[in-house]
Amino acid sequence: MQIKKFLQKKVIRFLNSKKILKLFFYYHKTFNNKGLKDLDFDFTERKNRLFIVNDIIKKKNYKKYLEIGCFDDELFNYVECDYKVGVDPVSGGNVRKTSDQFFNENKDYFDCIFIDGLHTYSQVKKDIENSIKFLDKGGIILLHDCLPNNFYAQATPRCQWTWNGDVWKAIVEFRTKENLDVYTCYADFGIGVIFDRPNQNLLDYPKWMK
C-alpha cells in the first residue's frame, strides 16, 4: 500500500511538472484539430474565444447558449445567439447563482455550453458532468483555460495574476471516457471541446494512476 501511495505521488508530481505541461501543450497543437473537422472551423488560426463561440453558433445554427462563469460579461454580452443564459454568483450574466445551484434547478437544454467558472479540477469536473445532462443532441461543450503555459499558471491554490487553474486535469480525465469525444485546441489559453459521442482518440493510462 505504501509503495502504491509513493508511486501515485510521483505520478502526480510528474503530471504537474513543467515538462509534461509543455508536452501536453504541443501534443494538442499538433494533433487535436483532426477530430474537429465537422465544426468547419480552423482552430490553427488561434482565434480568441469570442470569435470561436460565435463562429460555431453561426455555422451550426445553434439557438440556445449557456455560459458558466461570466466575469464582467467579457464574453457573454457579445455572444450572438437567440437565447442566452449566463450563470455567475458575483458579476455578469443574467443568473446570479453558483453553477451547482443553477444545475440543480435547471430544466432547460442547450446547444452550446461554455464553461469558464471556478478554475479548479473538482469544480470543472462537476460543471462538465452537469453540462452533459443538459446538452441537446448535436450540441457542444466548450471550456476555457485548458492549456496553461507553465507550472505556476496552473498551480492550485493560485500563486500569480495570470492563472488558468488545473482545468487541464479534467480534460485529461474526460479523455479516458469511451462515451465522450474530447479535444483541446491551441487557442486563447486552450479551448476544450467536448462532443457527446463515442471517443475517437481514447486516452488509456494505468488504473493505479486514476
Where are these regions (language model features)?
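A short alpha-helical cap/connector motif
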Residues: 1-114, 118-210
